[in-house]
Amino acid sequence: MQNKFGFILVKPQLGENIGACARSMKNFGFNKLHIVEPKINFPNHKAKATSVGAYDIINKAKVYNNVENAVSKFNLIVSLSARRRDINKKHISLQDFQKILTSKRNLNIGLMFGPEASGLSNKDLSFSNYILQIPTSAKFKSLN
């Protein structure tokens, strides 16, 4: 199941964030990391240091100049956003996402996360099939 998923970080601002993402991915058996327009030079020592044992994910990460190229590697894009958006994209819950995974087994799925400070733009979201909202604390909604 893990090989079906790739993680797309759009305009990450900190090497530490990329490293923490790689480490979390490795904890759960994921290994496909795609990075769009990193705001820092990548790979860098901070990303590697924060990834601890996930150097393989950092070293194999693919870097893209734009979202369109990054998402072209997948046939389903699910964006994660803490904010509800007024755009023509279906917002889904975790339960909805589970149903999609069960009904469409042969998908190559990209999970897209936005920049740390601002989240995904509406333009970034336009490349998504769905927007997934994971329940979080009302006081701190950011997942990235």
Identify the meaning behind each predicted range.
Residues 1-144:
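Post-transcriptional modification and biogenesis factors for structured RNAs
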